[in-house]
Amino acid sequence: TPALQATYPSFSAALTDLNAVTAMTGPVTLTLAAGATEEAPAKGFTIGSATLNAALSSTNTLTITKAAGAATTLTAGIGTAAPNAASPDGILKIVGADYVTIDGLTLVDGNTTNPETMEFGIGIFKASDADGAQHNMIRNCTITLNRINNASGSGPMVEGSVGINMVNSIPTAATTSLTPSGASGTNSNNSFHSNVIENCNYGIVINGYAASSPFTLGDTGNDIGGGSPATGNTITNFGGGGTSNPAAGIRVNNQWSANISN
């Protein structure tokens, strides 16, 4: 196990040390204090780095959860970007990391005007064309954004605010689609279960690479809702701004062997 501290003064401080990890010998769990609230830094909390991503595996997993009791809330900062910006605003993002579980957190965007509103609650991005995000689980989270953000997107970034947004791009060039260099560069085998998502333009979006046959460079095996009603997601009050731009509870594009069920 990496030499992390037993306790940290903030989630941000814990992530700084976590992203500096170079080796792991077993699973790591970060348990956030019940009732705690922390504001995200500009562009959001980030999980993923070149060293951490190389250390994570099916046995060296990362779980971020909360202690029993009152909700643990991550709040949005003040955004500056629109959905068609290269570097969108969000609360929490996974960047190329694998085997990460986000369990039971509450994410809230209290901004009420654009462009201060967030483009995503939880974003899942690639670190590079060779390092996609794989085998991650987002479950039991409550995500509330602002559906007034219905502005036009660009490239793989869709219109407006998205509760959970998985994108074929890196977070600092989010509107530029990547061509995966191999299967490791896809966003594959990720699961989204038992989340409550509200007041967004889209609830969940998974947007992959338009692969050609035999589709080895396409996203594969992503799962929205699991196999029973207990693991379904609740998505309400989506679509907004009163504009003609599209909105949906779930939007899926360029995916293979995906599951969508509630």
Tell where the protein language model's regions lie, with residue ranges:
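Extracellular beta-strand/beta-solenoid scaffold signature
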Residues: 44-47, 78-93, 114-129, 151-187, ...
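Feature marks extracellular polysaccharide-active and adherence modules
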Residues: 33, 65-67, 95, 103, ...
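Right-handed parallel beta-helix/beta-spiral solenoid domain characteristic of secreted/periplasmic
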Residues: 38-119, 145-159, 231-240
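Acidic Gly/Asp/Thr-rich repetitive segments characteristic of extracellular carbohydrate-active
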Residues: 1-31, 44-46
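Acidic helix-start/capping segments at beta-turn-to-alpha-helix junctions
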Residues: 31-39
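Residue-level recognition of the N-termini of beta-strands and the immediately preceding loop/turn
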Residues: 26-30, 60-62, 133-136, 160-162, ...
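Hydrophobic or amphipathic alpha-helical targeting/insertion segments
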Residues: 100-101, 127-137
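Surface-exposed acidic, glycine-flexible loop patches that form ligand/cofactor-binding
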Residues: 17-25, 52-55, 129, 183
